[in-house]
Amino acid sequence: NRYKGLRSPHKLKMAVSGCTRECAEAQGKDVGVIATEKGWNLYVCGNGGMKPRHAELLASDLDKETLIRYIDRFFMFYIQTADRLQRTSVWRDNMEGGLDYLKSVIVDDSLGLAAELERRMEHIIGTYQDEWRTAVENPEVRKRFQTYINAGANEQADPHIQFTTERGQIQIG
């Protein structure tokens, strides 16, 4: 849930595989993590679908804290530099310097941005709010919504919807 609600130029897909058999297909995702005997390998910028592309190894044998730090940096750098609706794989393909440049920014902090990227991610994580949970739990917000089909006994049902019973199941007629 760490990245839940993270707004990015395009949807993000992640996977974690517990071994090198790679059952979760982590190398076909925007961020893929594969367990090793010494820690975790971090793969980035993969893509499935119409234009499949294997993710590339960004860093290997990472401990958990370093892994999360690199993922945070990667996501924030992508969010800040990618074009609207641009997948990570296309972003990476268009990046001058390619994977070497990305490694230098994320792993080696060549631009001196690491602390700022991490701070921004922590801010996003710390201020995340599930809008739908707020709507469900706050009666004032709930007043803006109206019941449609599933009106309870004490609520006004929609008069335009007729229910029938067919084979013992309620159907909309």
Model-derived features: positions:
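Peripheral terminal and linker regions in Fe-S/redox and tRNA-modifying enzymes
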Residues: 1-173
